[in-house]
Amino acid sequence: MITKEEAQKIAKLARLKFEEDTIEKFFTQLSTIMDMIDILNEIDCKDIEPLTSVCNMNARMREDAVTSSDLSSELFDNVSGNSAQLAKEVKYFITPKVVE
């Protein structure tokens, strides 16, 4: 159980501001949370192995395969307009100026 002064200090450290009518509600809720944490701390967990996942299934991995990832020729085949040939040569999309 925490005191009202401790609750006010925690609120100040967390930069929380409460009106006088809501500080009591904050104190009550914080006390309840701290009581729940105390209950959890009483549980003996020394014989329980930590979980890395909630289901014990192993992930099926695929074999790594080296593939060509150069899609630039396919991308630049879709370029149209006056600058299409230049875009294919320099491998940049040429767009109209949008910022002055």
Curated annotation (Swiss-Prot):
Annotated keywords: ATP-binding, Ligase, Nucleotide-binding, Protein biosynthesis
InterPro entries: Asp/Glu-ADT_sf_sub_c, GatC
Single GO biological process annotation from the record: regulation of translational fidelity
GO molecular function, one term: glutaminyl-tRNA synthase (glutamine-hydrolyzing) activity
Pfam families: GatC
Recorded catalytic activity of this chain's protein: L-glutamyl-tRNA(Gln) + L-glutamine + ATP + H2O = L-glutaminyl-tRNA(Gln) + L-glutamate + ADP + phosphate + H(+); L-aspartyl-tRNA(Asn) + L-glutamine + ATP + H2O = L-asparaginyl-tRNA(Asn) + L-glutamate + ADP + phosphate + 2 H(+)
Root EC class: ligase
EC number: 6.3.5.-
Family to which this protein belongs: Belongs to the GatC family.
Function: Allows the formation of correctly charged Asn-tRNA(Asn) or Gln-tRNA(Gln) through the transamidation of misacylated Asp-tRNA(Asn) or Glu-tRNA(Gln) in organisms which lack either or both of asparaginyl-tRNA or glutaminyl-tRNA synthetases. The reaction takes place in the presence of glutamine and ATP through an activated phospho-Asp-tRNA(Asn) or phospho-Glu-tRNA(Gln).
PANTHER family cross-referenced by the UniProt entry: GLUTAMYL-TRNA(GLN) AMIDOTRANSFERASE SUBUNIT C, MITOCHONDRIAL (PTHR15004:SF0)
Subunit and interaction comment: Heterotrimer of A, B and C subunits.
Official protein name in the record: Aspartyl/glutamyl-tRNA(Asn/Gln) amidotransferase subunit C
UniProt source species: Rickettsia peacockii (strain Rustic)
